[in-house]
Amino acid sequence: PGRIGVAAVTAGPGVTNTVTAIKNAQMAESPLLLIGGAAATLQKGRGALQDIDQLSLFKTLCKSCVSVRAVRDIVPALREAIVTAQSGTPGPVFVELPIDVLYPFHVVEKEIGGTKSARGLRGKVVRWYLQNYLRNLFAGAWEPRDMSPLPVKVPLATEDEVGF
C-alpha cells in the first residue's frame, strides 16, 4: 500500500506503445500513473507531429484521463491522478502533458512570440491572441503548490467481511 508505478513516455508512439501494459495494470488492479507527452496545445488538431487523440485511446483502460492545459495545473493534476489510481479498486490513470506546458516561459514565448511587428488588423489580432494564450498558459505558474505527501489509505476488512 502507498506505492504506485510511474511511467513517463513521449507523445504519439511512446504513448500508444503502452496500451498493452496499461491493460495489464487494469486487469491486475495495479495503481499506475502514465505520464504522456503531447503536441503543443496551440497545435492540437492541426496536424502537428505525433498529434493523436490519446485521451480517447485510454478512456476505457484508465480510471481517469486528464490533459493539463496550464502550468499551474501540473502539480494538482498529478496529485489527483495518484489519489485516483490508489483509491477504491486500484488501477491505471493517464495524464497528458502538452509540450508547451513543460517548457520554460522564455522558450515558449520565443516560439510563439514571433509576430512582434504585426501589420494590419489580422496581424494585430493574431499577436493579441498569442500573447493572451501565453499569459493564460503561465498564469499562476509560480504560485506555491501543495507538495505535502499524499495520505496513504489502507482499506481494512470489517468483522462482517471477515466472517467472525
Task: Locate the predicted segments by residue.
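N-terminal alpha/beta PP-like core and its mobile active-site loop of ThDP/TPP-dependent enzymes
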Residues: 1-164
